[in-house]
């Protein structure tokens, strides 16, 4: 690169100094300086998805959109992120615009519902104002809005059935995101917007699918995740879960268009052991010979379900395999697996008290 004139450099430094005095430290910087740090992330609770995102989870200080058809696992993924944030000592806010949050299911996924901040707003404006107030406090690590489609503008709620309200929701989202984007970045909070799919009428070529709430969220989101249910997991005659595929359709912090596949088990959430088996085989850390799965000299079991069960019963083996995979992808290592739901913790506390 050509050398910049010394007088120009001095002028730039003086200008930057004045800007920092006026607007605060970090308001302007050179990209090559140490002040631009690596992007921190919070794990999604799914090893394959953490790898697909490139930085080991969803980026802090950014907006994330999770969208897909009904019952594909969007809220489950958001709740897993909430649980991971709480494990690190973070605070989580949940704007339940759909009025459909199931606390017992959230507890099963590892969410500390006692300390989860929940709001069930009456209007879209109220929901987004509450979200902004929580983010502005600087104490919230993750804010989840479930869902954009349920953020109904006040005019629509107060109006009559059949009234036309074209573009109201899109305008509301555009205005809210303009206000939120800067605050989210400054407070290093992750804003997760869950969104639904709609069909565009009269589309001949390309995908007729679109998300609700206009185009603003597509632009402001640093990460967009397309969640699809691709198969059902059967045990005997009953269905016990879904096979889910996520495509990273937009990623501003790592290469996009990567995919992750995993099991979501009913009342349990993402199957960690199933994910370790799948990724382990893909990375050749777990060997598959016929129907048998093995890790070094350890035989995990015949068939995937038996291998999953072995890892459930032997968490230290699962941890060892997971850390090898994480090391290979330069992701932070796991210290220990503590998978106790708040119900189990409460049960233990009650037992201890009764023993006393």
UniProtKB/Swiss-Prot annotation:
One of the Pfam families matching this protein, by short name: RecA
InterPro entries per UniProt: AAA+_ATPase (IPR003593), DNA_recomb/repair_RecA (IPR013765), DNA_recomb/repair_RecA_CS (IPR020584), P-loop_NTPase (IPR027417), RecA-like_C (IPR049261), RecA-like_N (IPR049428), RecA_ATP-bd (IPR020588), RecA_C_sf (IPR023400)
Swiss-Prot/TrEMBL keywords: ATP-binding, Cytoplasm, DNA damage, DNA recombination, DNA repair, DNA-binding, Nucleotide-binding, SOS response
Highest taxon, organism lineage: Bacteria
Disulfide bond positions: none
Location in the cell: Cytoplasm
Chief location bin: cytoplasm
Molecular functions per Gene Ontology: ATP binding; ATP hydrolysis activity; ATP-dependent DNA damage sensor activity; damaged DNA binding; single-stranded DNA binding
Binding residues for ATP: 68-75
A single GO cellular-component term on record: cytosol
SUPFAM superfamilies according to UniProt: P-loop containing nucleoside triphosphate hydrolases, RecA protein, C-terminal domain
UniProt-listed PROSITE patterns: RECA_1, RECA_2, RECA_3
Any GO BP: DNA recombination
Purpose: Can catalyze the hydrolysis of ATP in the presence of single-stranded DNA, the ATP-dependent uptake of single-stranded DNA by duplex DNA, and the ATP-dependent hybridization of homologous single-stranded DNAs. It interacts with LexA causing its activation and leading to its autocatalytic cleavage.
Assigned protein family: Belongs to the RecA family.
Protein name, per record: Protein RecA
Gene coding for it: recA
């Amino acid at each position: 690169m050509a050398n910049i004139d010394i007088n120009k450099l001095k002028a730039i430094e003086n200008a930057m100094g004045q800007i920092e005095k006026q607007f605060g430290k970090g308001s302007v910087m050179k990209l090559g300086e140490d002040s631009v740090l690596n992007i921190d992330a919070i794990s999604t609770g799914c090893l394959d998805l953490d790898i697909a995102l490139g930085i080991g989870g969803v980026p802090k200080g950014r907006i994330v959109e999770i969208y897909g058809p009904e019952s594909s696992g969007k809220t489950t993924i958001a709740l897993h992120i909430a649980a991971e944030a709480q494990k690190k000592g973070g605070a989580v806010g949940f704007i339940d615009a759909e009025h459909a949050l199931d606390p017992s299911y959230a507890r099963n996924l590892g969410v500390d519902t006692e300390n989860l901040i929940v709001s069930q707003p009456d209007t879209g404006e109220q929901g987004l104002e509450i979200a902004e107030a929580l983010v502005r406090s600087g104490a919230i690590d993750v804010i989840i809005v479930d869902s954009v489609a349920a953020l109904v503008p006040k005019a629509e709620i107060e109006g009559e059935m059949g009234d036309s309200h074209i573009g109201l929701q899109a305008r509301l989202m555009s205005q809210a995101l303009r206000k939120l984007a800067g605050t989210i970045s400054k407070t290093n909070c992750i804003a997760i917007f869950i969104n639904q799919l709609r069909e565009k009428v009269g589309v001949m070529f390309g995908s007729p699918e679109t998300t609700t709430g206009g185009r603003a969220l597509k632009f402001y989101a640093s990460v967009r995740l397309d969640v699809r249910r691709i198969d059902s997991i059967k045990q005997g005659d009953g269905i016990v879960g879904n096979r889910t595929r996520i495509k990273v359709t937009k990623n501003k912090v790592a290469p996009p268009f990567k995919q992750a596949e995993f099991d979501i088990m009913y009342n349990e959430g993402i199957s960690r052991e199933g994910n370790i088996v799948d990724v382990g085989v893909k990375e050749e850390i777990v060997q598959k010979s016929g129907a048998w799965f093995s890790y070094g000299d350890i035989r995990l079991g015949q068939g995937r379900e038996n291998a999953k069960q072995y890892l459930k019963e032997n968490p230290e083996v699962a941890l060892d395999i997971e850390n090898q995979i994480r090391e290979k992808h330069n992701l932070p290592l796991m210290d220990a697996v503590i998978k106790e739901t708040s119900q189990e913790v409460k049960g233990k506390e009650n037992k201890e008290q009764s023993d006393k």
